[in-house]
């Protein structure tokens, strides 16, 4: 739904607000990266399996397990131990996820008042965290091993944060200020 809206009305609004004459020059979504960090995943294999399964349900494609790059003795972490999982969404799955995020997950999120400019990284990308992954309708609360948080990064082709904010607000991302 959001992808067809992108190609119809939102692209025209973005072009008008940014001030470009060609759709190729207009900023657009590139990818959405979802990641889950699990500190105790090396000692609890059921937690890792549950996180991979839940993230795969949310994203619509299989999540990849991330491993530690180096050993850190104070964290009882060895090189190669699993520490989380991640998935990168592009094209159709990206727009499906954004649609579910905006219209199903964020309205159910506790104390969510909108995004701010602090969510941007200075290069036109927006990152934020969700404290509970069970706000997505695909995840069954009864089958979840433990409630986990997740990081979401929306990568755009915009060169500045202002252009990215225009793009995201044209698609319905709520902003506070």
Curated annotation (Swiss-Prot):
DNA-binding in keyword set: no
Subunit structure: Part of the 50S ribosomal subunit; part of the 5S rRNA/L5/L18/L25 subcomplex. Contacts the 5S rRNA and the P site tRNA. Forms a bridge to the 30S subunit in the 70S ribosome.
Source taxon at top rank: Bacteria
Molecular function in Gene Ontology: rRNA binding; structural constituent of ribosome; tRNA binding
Cited InterPro entries: Ribosomal_uL5, Ribosomal_uL5_bac-type, Ribosomal_uL5_C, Ribosomal_uL5_CS, Ribosomal_uL5_dom_sf, Ribosomal_uL5_N
NCBIfam families xrefs: PRK00010.1
Any one GO biological process: translation
Protein name, entry field: Large ribosomal subunit protein uL5
Keywords linked to the UniProt accession: Ribonucleoprotein, Ribosomal protein, RNA-binding, rRNA-binding, tRNA-binding
Family designation: Belongs to the universal ribosomal protein uL5 family.
Functional description taken from the UniProt entry: This is one of the proteins that bind and probably mediate the attachment of the 5S RNA into the large ribosomal subunit, where it forms part of the central protuberance. In the 70S ribosome it contacts protein S13 of the 30S subunit (bridge B1b), connecting the 2 subunits; this bridge is implicated in subunit movement. Contacts the P site tRNA; the 5S rRNA and some of its associated proteins might help stabilize positioning of ribosome-bound tRNAs.
Entry coiled-coil feature ranges: none
Classification via Gene3D superfamilies: 3.30.1440.10
